[in-house]
Amino acid sequence: MFPERGASEEEVLRELEEKTREDLTFDSGKILGSMCTYPHPFAVKVVMKYIDRNLGDPGLHIGSQKIEKEAVDMLANLLGLEKGYGHIVSGGTEANILAVRAMRNLAGIEKPELILPESAHFSFIKAAEMLGVKLVWAELNDDYTVNVKDVEKKITDRTIGIVGIAGTTGLGVVDDIPALSDLALDYGLPLHVDAAFGGFVIPFAKALGYEIPDFDFRLKGVKSITIDPHKMGMVPIPAGGIIFREKKFLDSISVLAPYLAGGKIWQATITGTRPGANALAVWAMIKHLGFDGYKEVVKEKMELARWFASELKKIPGIYLIREPVLNIVSFGSEKLEELEKELKARGWGVSAHRGYIRIVVMPHVKREHLEEFLRDLREIAKRL
């Protein structure tokens, strides 16, 4: 019920504290299945300082709009492009929807079809329903990457584009994006890469010597990329990114908003009102950590993920789904449902994903947290 009379701040905060006691918190070390993390303290400071900025009305916040553009260009540069076109958006879901919308609008085809891997994120299902696009699912290889030959088989005159994944949600697998890029160029189709997770991991992992195929704008067939700063970028939620290679993609999804303070403003994002503070935090975190800073974060988590995977192999009844590619480790068990239930009963924030449990070694995850998890896992697996 909407209260007739207000309560004091202390009373409201006390009630909030009581009602959120069931929430798991990142600092507990119990959240192991999330692709988000506790934001960097500096990013929190920036958001708090600029909490009132609205990028949906850039005429009021001209400086913030310019900073967003700089943030987009820095992300584009990280992804192999000197200058990019796009926005800081609510997350990977919105970014993927915008990419599909751009492909559909530019193609101008009746009954449009989009080819994507069976491993693709559910946001593409939302995009398809919203935009009237038929999804054509491509099979996976034994290593869980998309079968490029199957992608080619499914190209028709109704195909508006192809999707590749750089860091799948379940396993952190990176598709053969170079082969998909060549295929897209051969057929004159745009390739969208969903690097919501991998975008803030792969460039740094490659610099560290990890053998991961190219996935970004260095490949000519790649026309758009989703990247989420609120994942490994450690920016407060919400902060996703959509980057286009060419301005025509952004123009194709822009609509006129004539009543705003800046005059005739063209708006491409799904959300009208947008938190400028988070875009500023993206800019600030990139400036603060730089490539070397993020490389150190990725180095620690990639090494920790590989140690964790090696420990899992020692537990009877537990098996890896595949060797980790990024900082995601997924494992299975013959008694997965019971195992998941027992782990949750002990307070672990994990979930069974398509027949396995996924552990994401995010910045908040420390070795001591994983050691505690392994102790519980060994005990439960032995009893089951």
Curated annotation (Swiss-Prot):
Disruption phenotype: No growth on standard medium. Growth can be restored by the addition of exogenous beta-alanine or coenzyme A, but not by the addition of GABA. Inhibited by hydroxylamine. One of its GO terms (molecular function) is pyridoxal phosphate binding. The modification N6-(pyridoxal phosphate)lysine is found at K231. Gene3D superfamilies: Aspartate Aminotransferase, domain 1 (3.90.1150.10), Type I PLP-dependent aspartate aminotransferase-like (Major domain) (3.40.640.10). Optimum temperature is 85 degrees Celsius. Pfam families: Pyridoxal_deC. Optimum pH is 8.0. InterPro entries: GrpII_AminoAcid_Decarb, MfnA, PyrdxlP-dep_de-COase, PyrdxlP-dep_Trfase, PyrdxlP-dep_Trfase_major, PyrdxlP-dep_Trfase_small, Pyridoxal-P_BS. Keywords: Decarboxylase, Lyase, Pyridoxal phosphate. Its EC number is 4.1.1.11. It catalyses: L-aspartate + H(+) = beta-alanine + CO2. It comes from the Archaea. Pathway: Cofactor biosynthesis; coenzyme A biosynthesis. GO terms for biological process: carboxylic acid metabolic process; coenzyme A biosynthetic process. Homodimer. Can also form homohexamers. Belongs to the group II decarboxylase family. MfnA subfamily. Catalyzes the decarboxylation of L-aspartate to produce beta-alanine. In vitro, can also catalyze the decarboxylation of L-glutamate to produce 4-aminobutanoate, but this activity does not seem necessary in vivo. Shows much higher activity with L-aspartate than with L-glutamate. Does not decarboxylate L-tyrosine. PANTHER family: PTHR42735, SPHINGOSINE-1-PHOSPHATE LYASE 1. This is L-aspartate decarboxylase. It comes from Thermococcus kodakarensis (strain ATCC BAA-918 / JCM 12380 / KOD1) (Pyrococcus kodakaraensis (strain KOD1)). The gene is mfnA.
